[in-house]
């Protein structure tokens, strides 16, 4: 292991020298003792010609030379456009996770070990030549004994030691950056590496990917928008995934889509609808929707349907995040920057002590120029990125779910405008958002929420009774205090008032909207009313 670490260190050093990454480092505002290293590094003693490559290109090529783990780290960095200079972020978007396949016989051996059966006992046909190969796994086409056409994904052998060493060096570099640079500390490099560590280890577990794919397939069962291939659970293991083989055109195959006369406007709009459906209806979204993972069905090109694969990375939002995100977008497009600032504070995305006026002014300064463009030219992803950049100056905490959301939105938006350059994302999304906001406050939704809470009321009633008993019997070791001397009296009266109002509202809703449930649910409302009255009038 130590030998591997030393070899990796020398490899990193060679790449740094080759692409002159030390020039990028010493261009930063570093402490004097770090800048003094320029004069003691042997390779800097020799005259060197000025590189013709930009810093972004050099950084990208260096990551490619360092191998798959650094490539995937660069891909993760490319999603953090709120942290990186624009030229570097643009170059990192070009990173391709393509590596030569590993030995076919070794792949067969690994599959047989995982399945506990011979290939010929499970598959009537197995193509030894892989369909695709990436840094974490490779994919083979096959046919099950029962006749279904499938693909078999198998994790590369021996990855964990390599990943462990590369992550160790990434953590060392991140900690050094945090110690020597105040600017670097604002970017939270250690947190970025920690996020990457979780992502890369999650991708090694194919059962997790299978579960994600099954969930996404269930969410869009019978949908005209998106198809997700079936997972064959009987043949899925931690390092082997067997799922339905799909046939379609890659979403970037513009010539093929044109040849089958695909309705490109509808295809682009459906991509936006899929995104907002995942975010606001399901709160479960495919977070790796780059063009390599998206296909278009060849059936019914006048009503095109997407096909999604590779569900290794997914994201989700809490109901609170959903609500704040929707209201942020509405407030932004109304140019209500004070509302945007207030929502960031209310949501906890920025500290509560943030000065509202200063935050509002910063958001206005960054975002107002965006509205000089027509709506169809405004980028949702850029809007989120600008908001995050501004909020970071006010100590916004890193929100992993929002980072995944921003990455997914940038992918969907870029793809939609590639398919149909005139796509007006706001006009496409606005009706969906408005409908979602209406549904959140509809009587049906409120009743559903109330009914789910009713199931908890017996437990709450028991807790209320215990609380009242404890308050009426002070602890033996504590001297009794007069009620009027108790500091918690205002709080208890406020709780009592809330119980009174809550009980009254519940009783009214049940009598108006669910008469058939009245006999079942009247007693929890009565308990709330009695408890509230007791807390208010007691002496």
From Swiss-Prot:
Membrane topology category: Multi-pass membrane protein
Function (record text): Is probably a protein kinase regulator of UbiI activity which is involved in aerobic coenzyme Q (ubiquinone) biosynthesis.
Residues that, per the record, bind ATP: 131-139, 153
UniProt similarity note: Belongs to the ABC1 family. UbiB subfamily.
Compartment annotation: Cell inner membrane
NCBIfam families: PRK04750.1, UbiB
GO molecular function: ATP binding; protein kinase activity
Gene Ontology terms: cellular component: plasma membrane
Biological process annotations from GO: regulation of ubiquinone biosynthetic process; ubiquinone biosynthetic process
Gene field: ubiB
Protein name stated in the entry: Probable protein kinase UbiB
Entry's EC annotation: 2.7.-.-
Record domain Protein kinase: where: 125-492
The protein's enzyme class: transferase
CDD domains: UbiB
This protein's UniProt keywords: ATP-binding, Cell inner membrane, Cell membrane, Kinase, Membrane, Nucleotide-binding, Transferase, Transmembrane, Transmembrane helix, Ubiquinone biosynthesis
Pathways involved: Cofactor biosynthesis; ubiquinone biosynthesis [regulation]
Entries under HAMAP family matching the protein: UbiB
Transmembrane segments: 23-43, 494-514, 517-537
Record InterPro entries: ABC1_dom, Kinase-like_dom_sf, UbiB, UbiB_bact, UbiB_kinase
Active site: residue positions: 288 (proton acceptor)
């Amino acid at each position: 292991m130590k030998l591997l670490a030393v070899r990796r260190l020398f490899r990193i050093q060679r790449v740094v020298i080759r692409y002159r990454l030390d020039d990028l480092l010493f261009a930063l505002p570093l402490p004097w003792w770090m800048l003094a290293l320029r004069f003691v590094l042997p390779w800097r003693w020799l005259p060197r010609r000025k590189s013709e490559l930009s810093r972004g290109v050099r950084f990208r090529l260096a990551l490619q030379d360092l191998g798959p783990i650094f490539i995937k780290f660069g891909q993760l960095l490319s999603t953090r456009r709120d942290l990186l200079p624009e030229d570097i972020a643009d170059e990192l978007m070009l990173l391709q996770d393509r590596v030569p396949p590993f030995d076919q016989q070794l792949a067969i051996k690994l599959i047989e070990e995982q399945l506990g059966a011979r290939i010929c006992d499970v598959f009537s046909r197995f193509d030894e030549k892989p369909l695709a190969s990436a840094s974490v796994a490779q994919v083979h086409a096959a046919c099950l004994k029962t006749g279904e056409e499938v693909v078999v994904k198998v994790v590369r052998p021996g990855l964990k030691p390599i990943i462990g060493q590369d992550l160790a060096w990434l953590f060392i570099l991140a900690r050094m950056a945090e110690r020597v640079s105040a600017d670097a500390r604002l970017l939270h490099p250690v947190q970025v590496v920690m996020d990457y560590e979780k992502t890369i280890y999650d991708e090694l577990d194919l059962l997790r990917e299978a579960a994600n794919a099954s969930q996404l397939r269930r969410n869009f069962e019978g949908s005209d928008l998106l198809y997700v291939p079936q997972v064959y659970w009987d043949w899925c293991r931690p390092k082997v995934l067997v799922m339905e083989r799909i046939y379609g055109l890659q979403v970037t195959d513009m010539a093929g889509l044109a040849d089958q006369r695909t309705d490109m406007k509808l295809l682009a709009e459906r991509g936006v609808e899929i995104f907002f459906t995942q975010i606001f209806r399901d709160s479960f979204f495919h977070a790796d929707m780059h063009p390599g993972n998206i296909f278009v069905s060849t059936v019914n090109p006048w009503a095109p349907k997407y096909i999604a694969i590779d569900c290794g990375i997914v994201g989700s939002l809490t109901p609170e995040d959903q609500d704040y995100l929707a209201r942020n977008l509405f407030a932004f497009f109304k140019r209500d920057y004070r509302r945007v600032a207030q929502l960031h504070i209310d949501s906890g995305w920025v500290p509560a002590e943030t000065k509202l006026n200063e935050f509002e002014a910063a958001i206005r300064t960054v975002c107002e120029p965006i509205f000089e463009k027509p709506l169809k030219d405004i980028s949702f992803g850029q809007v989120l990125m600008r908001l995050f950049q501004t909020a970071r100056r006010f100590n916004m905490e890193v929100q992993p779910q929002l980072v995944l959301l921003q990455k997914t939105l940038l992918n969907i938006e870029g793809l939609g405008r590639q398919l149909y350059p005139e796509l007006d994302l706001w006009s496409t999304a606005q009706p969906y958002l408005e409908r979602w906001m209406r549904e959140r406050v509809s009587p049906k939704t409120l009743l559903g929420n109330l009914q789910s809470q009713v199931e908890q009321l017996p437990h709450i009633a028991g807790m209320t009774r215990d609380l009242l008993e404890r308050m009426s019997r002070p602890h033996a070791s504590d001297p009794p205090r007069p009620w009027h001397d108790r500091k918690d009296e205002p709080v208890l009266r406020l709780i009592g008032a809330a119980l009174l109002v809550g009980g009254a509202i519940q009783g009214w809703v049940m009598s108006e909207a669910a008469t058939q449930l009245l006999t079942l649910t009247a007693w929890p409302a009565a308990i709330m009313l009695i408890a509230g009255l007791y807390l208010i009038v007691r002496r």
